[in-house]
């Protein structure tokens, strides 16, 4: 199984990475992200977060392979404003996203489809720049639904024009507290099911087809089952054990198309999270050329 990228708009130890990065100043911290872990997208290598006494939050993403954005690039952040991965969107429980492409700055909120799919007006306080390989975002906490003085979970995101992606941290979210030293809230039992999405695939007789799917879980871990159908009959079942899953990338299953295919083919994906919550079953066509 391999992965490919998912655009931003498609759409506490168990749920987030605690803010234990190197302290930069009062009410400020940051963390490093792996270098060269993306091919086409802006390669995020560091994220810093800070706030002032007036409630303005500033986030910076440092990328190693861009001085200025390239065509099709997106840089941004997704926020879990209530610090609860079991509410909000299926993307780690985030409720809001800010997306910057070098010329346009957009805001998205959780939609009825479970993703960050509803574009909303940009608050006046939200600003973004990209210069010297650093994307900087600033805004009033309350303008994005963050309670002043409290904290939030955040993930940095980047997407390239060819479909690659990077997230920081690589899995789950980073917890930041506006009051230095404050702990994140404790999480309750995980009762929320994952959300799966199969993507229409294309196959050529006798060759290997790539079957893409997304497995989105608030706490970022699923065991996945993929079933391939010829008509109504299951002809192959593929199972992956419970492991970390990133909702911003597509997981790719390889399947060799019969040399002389007849009839209709499709595949279906379903998942179970660490607490035993079962996802929806989502299916997509395999179009044989």
Which residue ranges define each predicted feature?
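Surface-exposed, glycine/proline- and aromatic-rich loop segments on solvent-exposed faces
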Residues: 27-104, 158-167
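Extracellular acidic, Ser/Thr/Pro-rich low-complexity tracts
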Residues: 65-67, 143, 211-220, 230, ...
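Acidic/polar low-complexity flexible segments
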Residues: 83-97, 144-188
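Surface-exposed, short loops/turns at beta-strand junctions within beta-sandwich domains
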Residues: 258-263
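Short, compositionally biased P/S/T/A/G/V-rich stretches that sit at domain boundaries
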Residues: 27-48, 182-210, 289
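Aromatic sugar-binding surface patches on proteins
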Residues: 131-136, 245-254
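Solvent-exposed serine/threonine-rich low-complexity stretches and specific carbohydrate-binding patches
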Residues: 90-113, 119-127, 234-246
């Amino acid at each position: 199984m391999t992965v490919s990228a998912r655009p931003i708009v498609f759409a506490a130890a168990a749920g987030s990475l605690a803010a234990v990065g190197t302290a930069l100043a009062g009410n400020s911290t940051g963390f490093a992200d792996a270098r060269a872990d993306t091919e086409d997208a802006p390669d995020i290598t560091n994220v810093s977060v800070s706030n002032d006494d007036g409630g303005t939050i500033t986030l910076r993403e440092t990328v190693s392979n861009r001085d200025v954005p390239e065509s099709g690039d997106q840089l941004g952040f997704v926020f879990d404003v209530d610090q609860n991965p079991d509410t909000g969107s299926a993307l780690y429980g985030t409720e809001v996203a800010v997306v910057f492409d070098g010329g346009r700055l957009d805001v998205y909120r959780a939609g009825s489809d479970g993703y960050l799919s509803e574009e909303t007006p940009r608050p006046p306080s939200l600003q973004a720049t990209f210069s010297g390989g650093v994307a900087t975002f600033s805004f009033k906490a309350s303008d994005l639904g963050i309670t002043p003085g409290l904290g939030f979970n955040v993930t940095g995101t980047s997407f390239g024009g060819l479909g690659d992606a990077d997230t920081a941290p690589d899995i789950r979210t980073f917890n930041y507290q506006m009051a230095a030293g404050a702990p994140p809230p404790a999480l309750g039992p995980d009762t929320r099911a994952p959300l799966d999405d199969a993507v229409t695939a294309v196959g050529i007789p006798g060759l290997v087809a790539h079957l893409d799917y997304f497995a989105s879980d608030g706490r970022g871990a699923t065991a996945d089952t993929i079933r391939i159908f010829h008509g109504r009959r299951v002809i192959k079942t593929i199972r992956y054990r419970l492991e970390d899953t990133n909702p911003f990338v597509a997981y790719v299953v390889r399947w060799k198309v019969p040399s002389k295919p007849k009839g209709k083919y499709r595949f279906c994906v379903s998942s179970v999270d660490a607490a035993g919550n079962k996802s929806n079953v989502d299916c997509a066509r395999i179009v044989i050329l």
